[in-house]
């Protein structure tokens, strides 16, 4: 389980995730990197769910990005189609959050591609806590996108037993 949060604000998109990998009720690893850069550093991607499944999806998504010259929405839709129709992929238990200068998207195992209205993505076991925190901070403060992601992940880590305080954060200027 995990928490992934992404915020768009003040000309930046920032995505962060915690580092905990659990097997049942046991913490197996505390410093996993669940957020990374794809497609020549132009796309930020994070995952929630089964780690091995997520790595498979990262590979497939990066393949779609290459095939569609980095066009995020097209690559996401094509991955979702593949996920829905390929029997081996349909059993994967993970979700992806992806973002670049143009869009922020959630790609689910049901074949859904969702672009949130407010540029806020939160998913995983601590996603609801992080979403509530980030939403309040977006509405009531002038904090940077990075500060909001850090704070939301911290709050999720305080509440969710499957989320820790080790954070991996990637940031991209929207002008790039």
Swiss-Prot record:
Mechanisms controlling activity: Allosterically activated by HslU binding.
Cellular compartments annotated: Cytoplasm
Key words, A-Z: Allosteric enzyme, Cytoplasm, Hydrolase, Metal-binding, Protease, Sodium, Stress response, Threonine protease
The UniProt record lists the keyword Protease: yes
Top-rank EC class of the record's enzyme: hydrolase
GO annotation, cellular component aspect: HslUV protease complex; proteasome core complex
UniProt-listed InterPro entries: ATP-dep_Prtase_HsIV_su, Ntn_hydrolases_N, Proteasome_sua/b, Proteasome_suB-type
Reactions listed under catalytic activity: ATP-dependent cleavage of peptide bonds with broad specificity
EC number of the protein: 3.4.25.2
Binding site for Na(+): 157, 160, 163
Keyword Hydrolase attached: yes
Protein name (record): ATP-dependent protease subunit HslV
Organism: Pseudomonas fluorescens (strain ATCC BAA-477 / NRRL B-23932 / Pf-5)
